């Protein structure tokens, strides 16, 4: 590790194979916490390259516990986190909204590292038991249209660095990696990122994959569509900037999206959304993220049609029914 750190401290970049080997060694416990923290710090001080990101991703995918749910052609809706905004669990609520609209979802999530509550915190608050049992996940897909994968059960490297990430309490390149390494290798993904360089980095990375995708970034720094400002959506062949008003929504304040101070607070907001008793801002932010996810799967539909489908899922109670069935099946 010493030679690698010297190389990085001299402002050099890693080759793809070097990055791959480093992450494999981290997962195998070959470096101590100080060395790993030093490595992480380098990537807090400069942007990661495409080669480095792909190498780290290669290692995680090679070491993952594979899960074959390809027959469902599912979508994952996921953000990098690390935007410092402490929003409520927008992507998790969007996942159940999309599942309620009839589209299979496989959510890959974790505990919050830089926020009060990650997707796994919300699931735990509802009594969900995490599992790596593929048969159980397949039943969940068949009966609920959604399955949940708790990242540490499938990515040993993520588990190995979890205490270091929590101790640093700032975004790291592992925030960038999480959305890229869903063990299912879903057919579709809606990915949220916290800055424009990462939007382009993700777009380059996904263009060499078979995944049908969209990458979103709110221009005021959110790693999801927040309706607080203009936002950019990038797909394989297109980039477009949208405004909230252009899609029929109001423009909201940061405080409208606050996730609270505890996982219990975040779970309460999540429940209000599913019960269709949330604030207008909370509901509409979930709707717009769900709508762009639906459009990834159904590109023949206009975004206005996808917004209508997402709203209907929440307002009809189908999203809530999906959640209730999911909790019942997965709390045993």
Predicted regions and their residues:
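Acidic, glycine/proline-rich low-complexity segments that act as flexible tails and inter-domain linkers
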Residues: 1-87, 101, 105, 252-257, ...
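Glycine-rich anion-binding loops and their surrounding alpha/beta cores
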Residues: 7, 59, 65, 87, ...
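Short amphipathic alpha-helical face segments that pack within enzyme cores
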Residues: 38, 93-97, 285, 289-292
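A glycine-rich phosphate/pyrophosphate-binding beta-strand-loop-alpha-helix module
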Residues: 40, 88-144
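Acidic, glycine-rich active-site loops and adjacent beta-strand->loop/helix elements
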Residues: 79-84, 109-115, 154, 219-220
